[in-house]
Amino acid sequence: MAHRARWTMSQVTELFNKPLIDLLFEAQQIHRQHFDPRQVQVSTLLSIKTGACPEDCKYCPQSARYKTGLETERLMEVEQVLESARQAKNAGSTRFCMGAAWKNPNDRDMPYLEQMVKGVKALGLESCMTLGTLTDSQAQRLAGAGLDYYNHNLDTSPEFYGNIITTRTYQERLDTLDKVRDAGIKVCSGGIVGLGETVKDRAGLLLQLANLPTPPESVPINMLVKVKGTPLADNDDVDAFDFIRTIAIARIMMPTSYVRLSAGREQMNEQTQAMCFMAGANSIFYGCKLLTTPNPEEDKDLQLFRKLGINPQQTAVLEGDNEQQQRLEQALLTPDTEEYYNAAAL
């Protein structure tokens, strides 16, 4: 199936009804037309402000409305963030993502956020932030600081969304994506499988993403991590093949986007992750923690990469870091390297 400018629900439903073997074959063919199938982009995600979020997202342990035992933390100091970015770079990541548990950032925090972006860029890393909804001015300021990507997930279909979140509308999410795009920042947006949604809802989510004026450059697909104390703690487990199918359809519908295995990898065995890569996933979060939930340790990822013959993708040289491409693969294999730029001294 050729890439379409706009998809219809019937076309997406047809993909969900397709035999999995045929679907994987189609997804892998499309993937190879646009990407090296042996290259996986590696990102690290840091929670720069944790907990006490006023939103009521039913899956999230950071909501102030749920008793999950999560300790709240104020916005991190800029140098603390940059030290984490150095460690991520030394471990082989090429993109550093910073997440804050806010409904939206306060203007008084913007100078610190801008410094974080500039510092991460000075390290030779791609930068990404997820801070909630943005104003036009805030998006422009982040773009001016050099932010590469902004993450703002749609989470699920418009029809099912109200069952999961009531404190932020679907349109607010779409509006933020528009502001990010208009500011010249690349868009990162995806969703979660396992919220209690139907197959039609999964199709609706992918339809929304693929039919944006410009599809997201990065599409994170999360498997629900059930956290005690949240309303979704007792949800049914996601069938591995259903998750793999969602990855494959995301690849088919958004052939030039990075499809990222995000939250939930700790729950997946190696075989499931391998099939996700075969289905067209070509990005992962690397490190022991995603915001506040577990993620496979680096050594496990390295072992799986070796078994599958996968290599970390080498990114374009950024901000004068002329050695990053040559060092990247070795850095991934040698996580304790001491080599890094001191952004604070720049």
From Swiss-Prot:
The keyword Iron-sulfur is annotated on this UniProt entry:
yes
> What's the domain of life for this entry?
Bacteria
| GO molecular function per UniProt | 2 iron, 2 sulfur cluster binding; 4 iron, 4 sulfur cluster binding; biotin synthase activity; iron ion binding
Keywords per UniProt: 2Fe-2S, 4Fe-4S, Biotin biosynthesis, Iron, Iron-sulfur, Metal-binding, S-adenosyl-L-methionine, Transferase
Q: Where on this chain does [4Fe-4S] cluster bind?
A: 53, 57, 60
Q: Which PROSITE patterns match?
A: RADICAL_SAM
Q: Which Gene3D superfamilies match?
A: Aldolase class I
The record lists the catalysed reaction(s) as: (4R,5S)-dethiobiotin + (sulfur carrier)-SH + 2 reduced [2Fe-2S]-[ferredoxin] + 2 S-adenosyl-L-methionine = (sulfur carrier)-H + biotin + 2 5'-deoxyadenosine + 2 L-methionine + 2 oxidized [2Fe-2S]-[ferredoxin]
Q: In which pathway does it act?
A: Cofactor biosynthesis; biotin biosynthesis; biotin from 7,8-diaminononanoate: step 2/2
Give start and end of each Radical SAM core domain.
38-256
- Please give a single GO biological process term from the UniProt record: biotin biosynthetic process
Cofactors, names only = [4Fe-4S] cluster; [2Fe-2S] cluster
* Binding residues for [2Fe-2S] cluster: 97, 128, 188, 260
Q: Which Pfam families match?
A: BATS, Radical_SAM
Q: How is the cofactor bound?
A: Binds 1 [4Fe-4S] cluster. The cluster is coordinated with 3 cysteines and an exchangeable S-adenosyl-L-methionine. Binds 1 [2Fe-2S] cluster. The cluster is coordinated with 3 cysteines and 1 arginine.
Q: What is its EC number?
A: 2.8.1.6
Q: Does the keyword Cell inner membrane apply?
A: no
Q: What does this protein do?
A: Catalyzes the conversion of dethiobiotin (DTB) to biotin by the insertion of a sulfur atom into dethiobiotin via a radical-based mechanism.
- What is said about its interaction partners and assembly? Homodimer.
Stored NCBIfam families: bioB
Family named by the database record: Belongs to the radical SAM superfamily. Biotin synthase family.
Task: Write the protein's name.
Answer: Biotin synthase
